[in-house]
Regions:
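Flexible, glycine-rich terminal cap/loop adjacent to redox cofactors
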Residues: 11, 56-62, 72-170
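A conserved FAD-binding loop/helix module that cradles the flavin
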Residues: 1-66, 150-170
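Active-site-adjacent helical/loop segments in soluble small-molecule enzymes
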Residues: 69
Length: 170
């Protein structure tokens, strides 16, 4: 229990992994506490989601990097994509967001994602964490229903464009 124990990595097909993060410690503590009190709940595994901010640069990641996926034996493929956050006609600060989605070339299952920008796009990594947890394929993400409003995002944004690029083989 906590960050001194192993957890099950959804990015590695449920294999035990040591991923020492506070969020993993909290969730395993909740599961242990409920089960100790007679309320049976099951942990759902982890993706190892994390983030860091260095000066103005925000970087977030979940699941496996390309190198980690290859080391784990996957046919690791990546889709790299860069796009400004908002519609280009919006005349406000509009930083670029860089995204890399890692997926298995055989099963097409999403294995990981990394994003970086001076814009705070950090909440977007949660969607990729859920995709890994639920075993979604890169193809399913390509046509994901996301809202659009020019002052917030693009009509076909970097999440979906990274996935769509993978579908097209770009």
């Amino acid at each position: 229990m906590g960050d001194c124990s192993s957890c099950y990595s959804n990015a590695k097909d449920g294999e035990p992994a040591y991923i020492a993060l506070a969020t993993n410690a909290v969730r395993s503590g909740i599961v242990a506490g409920h089960n100790a009190c007679g309320m049976a709940i099951e942990g759902v595994g982890v993706q190892g989601s994390s983030g860091i901010c260095i000066y103005d640069l925000k970087m977030v990641a979940t699941g496996l990097t390309e190198a980690a996926a290859r080391k784990a034996g996957y046919d690791a493929c990546v889709s790299d994509f860069s796009q400004v956050q908002k519609a280009t006609f919006v005349e406000t600060e509009n930083p670029e967001v860089k995204i890399c989605v890692v997926f298995d070339g055989t099963t097409r299952r999403v294995l990981g994602a990394q994003m970086a920008s001076t814009y705070d796009m950090s909440a977007g990594i949660h969607m990729f964490s859920l995709a890994i947890q639920e075993g979604l394929t890169i193809d399913r993400l390509a046509l994901l229903d996301v809202f659009f409003l020019p002052h917030f995002n693009q009509p076909y944004n970097y999440y979906t464009m990274a996935a769509y690029s993978a579908v097209l083989g770009a």
